[in-house]
């Protein structure tokens, strides 16, 4: 699969707007657009940068499907709108030709301890409290819970709900990757819980200064 390493960790079911200008990635776009289902894999760069190569890449990512492609004629650039889908795991990195490529496999959630509705609600309460603390510090009104936490709060699959919740919390790439790379829903719950605690601690420290 064609791969696009990024400096952010994309979770399933997220929008991904992109401006493509580096020659190897414009080649990737052209190759993808020849398919009926244009898509590529996205993974987090653990070291290095997106431009120029020489990066060190993580091995867990998501599939990004191109939903809109605008060829900026004469500029050598593309504007893309993509939507991330299923989680993937890299089995083997192939030589860049000219863009990164890898053998990948779909990686659905592995069996584990069930995540209960009470556990999800408790985590959602903590996320809501986090946003309420930020809003109070900035003296702004917070939208209602459904808008803050997402209209997909009734999602039956706890693993998918945790992805959706994580996408709304202001956590960094490393924490987002921990959420993405958690093998099971229960481990994802633990990873996101730790990330929320870390963000809350940072915010309290900043507000105390």
PLM region spans:
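N-terminal low-complexity, acidic/polar interaction/targeting segments
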Residues: 1-209
């Amino acid at each position: 699969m064609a791969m696009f390493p990024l400096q952010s960790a994309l979770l399933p079911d997220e929008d991904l707007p992109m401006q493509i200008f580096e020659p190897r990635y414009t080649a990737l776009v052209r190759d993808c657009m020849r398919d009926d289902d244009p898509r590529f894999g996205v993974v987090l760069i653990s070291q290095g940068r997106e431009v120029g190569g020489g990066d060190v890449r993580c091995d867990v990512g998501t599939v990004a499907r191109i939903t809109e492609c605008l060829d900026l004629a004469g500029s050598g650039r593309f504007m893309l709108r993509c939507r991330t889908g299923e989680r993937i795991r890299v089995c083997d990195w192939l030589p860049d030709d000219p863009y990164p490529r890898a053998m990948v496999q779909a990686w659905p959630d592995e069996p584990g301890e069930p995540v209960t509705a009470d556990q999800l609600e408790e985590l959602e309460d903590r996320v809501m409290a986090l946003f309420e603390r930020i809003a109070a510090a900035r003296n702004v009104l917070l939208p209602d819970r459904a808008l803050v936490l997402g209209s997909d709060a009734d999602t039956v699959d706890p693993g998918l709900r945790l992805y959706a919740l994580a996408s709304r919390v202001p956590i960094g790439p490393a924490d987002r990757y921990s959420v993405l790379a958690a093998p099971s829903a229960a481990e994802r719950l633990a990873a996101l819980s730790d990330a929320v605690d870390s963000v809350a601690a940072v915010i309290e420290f900043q507000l105390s200064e």
